[in-house]
Amino acid sequence: ERIGIIGICGWGGMALNAAAIDTRVKATVVSTMYDMTRVTANGYFDVMDENARYEMREELNAQRIIDFKQGDYARAGGVVDPLPEDAPQFVKDYHAYYKTDRGYHVRSLNSNDGWNRTSGLSLMNAKLLHYIPEIRHAVLVIHGEKAHSRYFGEDAFKELKGDNKELMIIPGAVSYTHLRAHETTLHL
C-alpha cells in the first residue's frame, strides 16, 4: 500500500508506463519528463514524418549489420563534448551537469558514450504512454515553464483521467530543473 514511482527526464515516461501496468502503485511523480518513444519516432516537436522515420530505420538496420560484423555495438555518444558555442541552452545545462563533477559517473550513459546507436529501433515503433488514461492513482506531473521538453508533460497530463492528477508548471524554470532534481529532493 506504500509503493510510489518517481521518474525524471526519460524515466518519467517510463514511470507513467509502469504506473499504468502495476496496480500496486499508489502515487506517481514525474519531473521534466520525456516521452522517449515519441521523441525517437517523431523528433523534437514532432518534426519527423514517415519518410524521415523510414530513412532512420534504414540507417539503424544497416548499423545492426555493422555491429554484428564487428562484434560490438556502436554508441550514439553521450552529451556532446566539447560543447559548441551555439549549443541550445538545455544542451549547455546537460554539459554542465553530466560532464562535470556535479553529475559525471563512469557508468552514466550521458557522461560517456551514450546508448547503442540501434536502441532507437525498439522505441520508435512503440507508444509508451498509450495506456496512461487508465491510471487510477494520484499522478503529479512537474515541468519548468521554459523547459524545451514541457510539451511532453503537458500532453501526457491531458491524457490522464480523474481528479487526483495535477500538472505543476514551475514559473521561470528551464531545462536545468530536471538536472537539479537528480541532485536534490528539494525541487520535488
Regions found by a protein language model. Give the residues of each.
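Conserved small/polar residues in nucleotide/adenosyl-binding loops
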Residues: 177-184
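Alpha/beta-hydrolase fold nucleophile elbow
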Residues: 2-9
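Conserved loop-alpha-helix segment in the C-terminal half of the alpha/beta-hydrolase fold
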Residues: 149-165
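Active-site nucleophile elbow and catalytic-triad environment of alpha/beta-hydrolase enzymes
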Residues: 115-131
